[in-house]
From Swiss-Prot:
SUPFAM superfamilies to which the protein is assigned, alphabetical: P-loop containing nucleoside triphosphate hydrolases
Domain Guanylate kinase-like intervals: 10-187
Function noted in UniProt: Essential for recycling GMP and indirectly, cGMP.
PANTHER family: GUANYLATE KINASE, GUANYLATE KINASE-RELATED
Molecular function as annotated in GO: ATP binding; guanylate kinase activity
Keywords (A to Z) from UniProt: ATP-binding, Cytoplasm, Kinase, Nucleotide-binding, Transferase
SMART domains per record: GuKc
Protein known as: Guanylate kinase
EC annotation from Swiss-Prot or TrEMBL: 2.7.4.8
Source taxon at top rank: Bacteria
Binding site for ATP: 17-24
Amino acid sequence: MNKAGQEARGFFIVLSAASGTGKTSIRRIFLERCPEVQFSVSYTTRTARPGEVDGQDYFFVTETDFRERIDQGEFAEWEENYGRYYGTSGKVMTRVLEQGRDMILDIEPRGAKTLKKNYQGGIYVFVLPPSLAELKARLRKRGESEAEIRKRLDKVREEIAEARGYDYVIFNDSLEKAVERLQVIYQAEKSRASRMSKQIQGVLDSE
């Protein structure tokens, strides 16, 4: 892609984390502060949680519907997680990026790996808990059983190991600080010289 095409096209941030790390809260506050960024609404077969809105938090669909979308090649990535399916629409993603808008995607490490193979130019950010002990306490507060917590922690260890393959790592030791760190990453990526050739030329022509 030439410089003009790279500058005109938006870029996307992939935000991943282990379960219970606070990724959703970070993403929501980030979007409030950076309204120019569009959230990629995923499809899922899980039921909506209290307060979630169809088409805003997720597109809630049946497993039959989801499988039909897989067969039609609609997803840029999809995965099964705890018996439920999640997927990102490739068509929507391509359209938004070609319009020059930036996006943020909230997906798990396995889905991020698939996306990385299929789409270039993404910025991959992994959110870490301060410690596994802190994460265990958060899961207990959510009312999960000890057996479920042990099961989740086994998977969490596998997910956290994937952080080494990401571009950036954010510790969620404080929600406010975590959001600020994500904002800094976004602004730094926006300021890359490869995305600023129009502004550079504007200064050169400003005499």
